[in-house]
Amino acid sequence: MQTTTQVKTPIVGKHVYGELYGVDEALLRDEEKLRRIVIEAAHIAKMHLVEVNSWRFKGGDKEGVSVIALVLESHIAIHTWPVYNYATVDVYTCGEHSDPMAAFRYIVSQLAPKRFTVNYSDRSYK
């Protein structure tokens, strides 16, 4: 009789990402407010903030704001398209004690979309 041993694959990261629909257009253009939301999301998720950068893009349907926080554990990113009332959110963490879903939920609560999707993925290696 042959036995099979299951090897537990180590989880090296937790990735939460999603799309937000029906967000207030003015909020999606408010670079400073979006920066504050990302910074607070990092604190809520028990992540250690290293640096926050943001960019404002102008020009028709490509107009929007991107905010990216580098955290010791990985990153948080928001990208917005105000003309579509749409944003994407990406929270990735390698820290065992950080909670990317808490960061995602906070961002959603602040942007108040009419609807949103959320996805979760364990990042692991074999």
UniProtKB/Swiss-Prot annotation:
PANTHER family per UniProt: S-ADENOSYLMETHIONINE DECARBOXYLASE PROENZYME
Catalyzed reactions per annotation: L-arginine + H(+) = agmatine + CO2
UniProt pathway annotation: Amine and polyamine biosynthesis; agmatine biosynthesis; agmatine from L-arginine: step 1/1
EC number: 4.1.1.19
Protein name as annotated: Arginine decarboxylase proenzyme
Family affiliation: Belongs to the prokaryotic AdoMetDC family. Type 1 subfamily.
Site, as annotated: Cleavage (non-hydrolytic): 73-74
Leading EC class: lyase
GO MF term list: arginine decarboxylase activity
Domain of life: Archaea
A single GO cellular-component term on record: cytosol
Record's cofactor remark: Binds 1 pyruvoyl group covalently per subunit.
Pyruvic acid (Ser) PTM positions: 74
Necessary cofactors: pyruvate
One Gene Ontology term from the biological process aspect of the record: polyamine biosynthetic process
Functional summary from the UniProt entry: Specifically catalyzes the decarboxylation of L-arginine to agmatine. Has no S-adenosylmethionine decarboxylase (AdoMetDC) activity.
Processing and modification events after translation: Is synthesized initially as an inactive proenzyme. Formation of the active enzyme involves a self-maturation process in which the active site pyruvoyl group is generated from an internal serine residue via an autocatalytic post-translational modification. Two non-identical subunits are generated from the proenzyme in this reaction, and the pyruvate is formed at the N-terminus of the alpha chain, which is derived from the carboxyl end of the proenzyme.
Keywords: Autocatalytic cleavage, Decarboxylase, Lyase, Polyamine biosynthesis, Pyruvate, Schiff base, Zymogen
Positions of the catalytic residues: 74 (schiff-base intermediate with substrate), 79 (proton acceptor), 94 (proton donor)
Subunit details: Heterooctamer of four alpha and four beta chains arranged as a tetramer of alpha/beta heterodimers.
Alphabetized NCBIfam families for the sequence: SAM_DCase_Bsu (TIGR03330)
InterPro entries (UniProt xref): AdoMetDC_fam_prok, ArgDC, S-AdoMet_deCO2ase_core, S-AdoMet_deCOase_pro-enz
